[in-house]
Amino acid sequence: MAGTLDLDKGCTVEELLRGCIEAFDDSGKVRDPQLVRMFLMMHPWYIPSSQLAAKLLHIYQQSRKDNSNSLQVKTCHLVRYWISAFPAEFDLNPELAEQIKELKALLDQEGNRRHSSLIDIDSVPTYKWKRQVTQRNPVGQKKRKMSLLFDHLEPMELAEHLTYLEYRSFCKILFQDYHSFVTHGCTVDNPVLERFISLFNSVSQWVQLMILSKPTAPQRALVITHFVHVAEKLLQLQNFNTLMAVVGGLSHSSISRLKETHSHVSPETIKLWEGLTELVTATGNYGNYRRRLAACVGFRFPILGVHLKDLVALQLALPDWLDPARTRLNGAKMKQLFSILEELAMVTSLRPPVQANPDLLSLLTVSLDQYQTEDELYQLSLQREPRSKSSPTSPTSCTPPPRPPVLEEWTSAAKPKLDQALVVEHIEKMVESVFRNFDVDGDGHISQEEFQIIRGNFPYLSAFGDLDQNQDGCISREEMVSYFLRSSSVLGGRMGFVHNFQESNSLRPVACRHCKALILGIYKQGLKCRACGVNCHKQCKDRLSVECRRRAQSVSLEGSAPSPSPMHSHHHRAFSFSLPRPGRRGSRPPEIREEEVQTVEDGVFDIHL
């Protein structure tokens, strides 16, 4: 029967189930493994797994009445294949597991041990870690000691550890997460996929922050060059997903506007940058990327955002059922969905060819968990190179590659609030890693010289005195943990930037944010941050522990999103893969609105659901 099914014309669930049973012979050999795997993977798109199990139980019971021993054993072979191919489904779905146990109990009662032995539900391992966003898997040790200083990390080392972090997060995504995203058009009640998207966005933002943390144009150019080579190594690892995140950060408007910085980037680096950008551009429906991915052998990490876009497009274009009664499923759509999801599922079966250093993983995890808004990054960019600054006169005529319509950020929703226990765990492990690697004399404290090295990994760190709470000239483990926990609590896990202070006067007394004493007098007795409005005494400036959080007006995401196309005007939810949007520029202070944004930014695409 498997050979007579014409999926393009549609079929019922029962017909497809019968076809999968008949795909087995009595010995358990599968004649049509593609059909069987497709149906077992895709059936939750149409019916719950518990209903499928009930249908299998009914078929087995009916075959007993008909004395069809062949049908009985084939049904058991299908159940065995299902458990073997998708074990997580049985561990995470208690109702499904109970139904299969009911079938096995029925076989045992009949004394049919041959058939019963085919169904081994009790040996399914636990997969609850796939549903726990806070779970951390053990990692292998590097044979040599690795420097944790960003400037000392080789591009391949950083590429390998970024690959490991994203791969570990990706392995937790299940079929049900993709199905939920496509049907709802968002990540509501989908924490695993939401966390992966946040990690992708964090990599892009971290790239921008590491560049903007450098005070001079030549220093920023060196960081850009470093990340271009990291992107090159990501391509060698065939990790296109993190490659997209890094290129998105390098191509962001907060970086692309730094003309003086780009004048210090070598022509060779610019050429390499352009090639990597062209690889992940949206031109031709990501044609360059798709061709490169198809030619890959071994481990490869596809750009999840591109394939989610494909799933959403299919969901909008084709119906699940071919009749109003919802009895004949759309086999053509099922095959197309399966081809996309099978490519994603293949990633988890091939481990990346990397080893990870636990200390560096802890450091990266905490670094990437910090969050800055686009406005904050853009504001820091303006502080580095104000718009009024004349163009640099440099013999180097290099310009950055044009900003591509890449997936800079996958969702316009706010970053999900992290579990506090996870934040504490990450911070404590990171601090322990810092002391193990940067406490050179082993006295259990960080000196000012050692602190300056650490600051290379955390450019948003406050002054040394803010961490040295007892002012003894060194920082203890407890003081460093306390600083990060305090910053995470006050700022909601979002580290800020240094203040842009100027002398100010006031007709009314204001309190110093550090010492809480009043700032008296109208003749510039205090300082005020131009970005966030924080006031403090001049003598308290370097001791202020509050990070700069630039004030911004509330922005309606619905108002800033482009209008849906006419053919989908009946839908109201919008899912955006890109930032910034034209509507958000109006929320910046007046000096930012004067900035001319590159016209290519309008080329980013939105998916409207």
UniProtKB/Swiss-Prot annotation:
Binding site for Ca(2+) 1: D439, D441, D443, H445, E450
Sites where the protein binds Ca(2+) 2: D468, N470, D472, C474, E479
Domain EF-hand stretches: 426-461, 455-490
SUPFAM superfamilies from the UniProt entry: Cysteine-rich domain, EF-hand, Ras GEF
Cited InterPro entries: C1-like_sf, EF-hand-dom_pair, EF_Hand_1_Ca_BS, EF_hand_dom, PE/DAG-bd, Ras-like_GEF, Ras-like_Gua-exchang_fac_N, Ras_GEF_dom_sf
Origin superkingdom: Eukaryota
Residue numbers spanned by region Disordered: 382-406, 557-592
PTM annotation, UniProt: Isoform 2 is palmitoylated and myristoylated.
PROSITE patterns: EF_HAND_1 (PS00018), EF_HAND_2 (PS50222), RASGEF_CAT (PS50009), RASGEF_NTER (PS50212), ZF_DAG_PE_1 (PS00479), ZF_DAG_PE_2 (PS50081)
Keyword annotations: Calcium, Cell membrane, Cell projection, Cytoplasm, Disease variant, Guanine-nucleotide releasing factor, Membrane, Metal-binding, Phosphoprotein, Repeat, Synapse, Synaptosome, Zinc, Zinc-finger
Location of the protein in the cell: Cytoplasm, Cytosol; Cell membrane; Synapse, Synaptosome; Cell projection, Ruffle membrane
Record-annotated N-terminal Ras-GEF domain positions: 4-126
Tissue expression remark: Detected in platelets, neutrophils and T lymphocytes (at protein level). Expressed in brain where it is enriched in the striatum. Also expressed in the hematopoietic system. Detected in heart, brain, lung, placenta, liver, skeletal muscle and kidney.
Quaternary assembly: Forms a signaling complex with RAP1 and BRAF. Interacts with RAP1. Interacts with F-actin.
Functional note: Functions as a calcium- and DAG-regulated nucleotide exchange factor specifically activating Rap through the exchange of bound GDP for GTP. May also activate other GTPases such as RRAS, RRAS2, NRAS, KRAS but not HRAS. Functions in aggregation of platelets and adhesion of T-lymphocytes and neutrophils probably through inside-out integrin activation. May function in the muscarinic acetylcholine receptor M1/CHRM1 signaling pathway.
Family membership noted in the UniProt record: Belongs to the RASGRP family.
Protein name from the UniProt record: RAS guanyl-releasing protein 2
Record organism: Homo sapiens (Human)
